[in-house]
């Protein structure tokens, strides 16, 4: 299987250290989507770390925004950064991302000789939601074909699609920030296609698509994480939101994240954490922004992962 996939891959060494990197293209002739980057440690793999970027976030984008991939591979993890659907040019109304992710995980575990029982998945923004949703479906289905993560994390992901619809509607209505106006208009268009219309028209569609839904019993899909270690990172800088977006706590992903962790604790999850990263979010160019991967501390993350997976 690995020989076949590597026919369509590029292999090179990462600058500055000896680990190899491969980009595996799963569809012949398509270098735009359905591919993933693999960072390979120079030792026997200690485990698998899957990191999913945000909306339109390629593997290159992820590696520019956070040192987590290189920190993890230096610590002995095999790191996979997938780009399975090109969000910029398509609308994933059939959740093709989930289907492809379910097949990618066993593929890389087999191809790169990774321990099957040492697997953490996570991501930033939409990538964090996708990681949460994947984990929920894995534990919900109880299907051996869906590899179950030992833990899941998200860096400021939106979890409740109904709340996100309301946020976009508000930002469009107040007409304050040009960036917010453009994003809100485009995302509302996508939501209408993906879910059929608004949450009031199709509440069930929004519940099914959300990785946390406070209107549903036990948080909706979140209930499937009641026994899974969960970390949700957030830079809850309300003053930045007020000054730059004229938003409120209700428009922040922090609302979803704190609610989800509280719900998991109500369900008995003793390993559900809301990680506050106030003031730590920055763009790669150094511009302050509380919605960026940089809020996560890579070194501390690896200490957490090693302890969780009992890796020395």
Per-region residue spans from a language model:
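Short substrate-entry loop that stabilizes the transition state in hydrolases
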Residues: 44-46, 51-90, 242
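N-terminal cap/lid segment of alpha/beta-hydrolase-fold proteins
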Residues: 18-43
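Alpha/beta-hydrolase active-site loop
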Residues: 92-113, 133
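Serine-hydrolase catalytic core
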Residues: 193-273
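Bacterial Sec-dependent N-terminal signal peptides
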Residues: 1-20
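Catalytic active-site module of serine/aspartate enzymes centered on a nucleophile-bearing elbow/loop
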Residues: 287-312
